[in-house]
Regions:
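Surface-exposed loop/linker segments characteristic of extracytoplasmic
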Residues: 8, 25, 29-266
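Hydrophobic membrane-insertion alpha-helices, especially the h-region
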Residues: 9-24
Length: 266
């Protein structure tokens, strides 16, 4: 067995330290940048799906539909099926619009029940189970496999309870109004009508599962605006500024461009 001098060992440890520092300072940030870019693309796709819904129906979908007894009934996410890339065709046909999200016919979207899937020509039949959180709804920086993209539900937002919003109601400007946010508070069942609640938010960018906008990305979170643009909001944004971007007709003297100019939004 070869013997190493103290000097050789010190040089080896020094070289290892340099290599480790290189990985931490160069490789890891590059990987995170790629994950953040993928997350931004997810939000872009979801935001454009909502804009397509608005174009087809003349209004945005209801964020959380409730039943007569007040319990959550359906989520806005199911209406994006037709406009999302990468979702299996079976999604378009299986969802039962006449029953609740957690009814027997709709639990197969997340409980592992085998379903028959085919390609768009009706061939290549196979039996499979659906992913409870499809990749389009999960941020690659979050390993928990939960829904990372939500809307903010509230009377002052684009998603008031049990009511559709038309774009002409967004008097603050489409470019100044957030539709889709990143969060760590999502469900592990992507069809569950569960989103962020405007009235209980503190309007800070968070790294906890506490009903706030937040992410695993260092320094902030991605959001999608009503004009289709996706931006990274840094945690330097004030609660007043973030709140203003979530209201549709608050008439606040705060614009996205001002925040971009200040470096608060990228």
């Amino acid at each position: 067995m070869p013997k190493f001098s103290l000097r050789t060992l010190l040089l080896l440890f020094f070289g290892f330290g340099i290599a480790l520092a290189f990985v931490c300072q160069v490789i890891f940030p590059i990987r995170e940048q790629a994950r953040r870019c993928s997350c931004s693309n997810n939000i872009k796709q979801i935001t454009l799906a909502l804009l397509n819904c608005e174009s087809v129906y003349g209004h945005l979908p209801i964020g959380i539909e409730t039943s007569p007894d007040g319990s959550p009934y359906r989520s806005w996410r199911r209406l994006t099926f037709f406009y999302m890339e990468g979702l299996p065709p079976v999604f378009y046909d299986l969802y039962d619009e006449n029953s609740a999200w957690d009814s027997k016919s709709n639990t197969r979207f997340y409980d592992g029940t085998p379903v028959v899937q085919t390609d768009k020509f009706g061939s290549n039949r196979r039996v499979d189970s659906l992913d409870p959180c499809p990749v389009s709804w999960c941020c690659p920086s979050d390993s928990t496999k939960r829904v990372n993209y939500a809307v903010v539900v509230g009377e002052e937002t684009a998603f008031p309870p049990n009511r559709n919003v038309k774009f002409d109601e967004i008097t603050d400007g489409l470019e100044n109004t957030i539709l889709v946010v990143e969060t760590l508070s999502g469900s592990d069942k992507w069809t569950e009508p569960r989103d962020l609640q405007f009235d209980s938010m503190s309007f800070v960018i968070s790294k906890s599962k506490n009903g706030e906008i937040g992410s695993r990305h260092p320094g902030g979170a991605n959001v999608g605006f009503a004009d289709g643009e996706v931006h990274f909001i840094t945690d330097a944004i004030s609660p007043e500024e973030l709140r203003a971007l979530l209201t549709i007709a608050g008439n606040e003297p705060i614009t996205r461009q001002q925040l971009i100019d200040r470096g608060v939004i990228r």
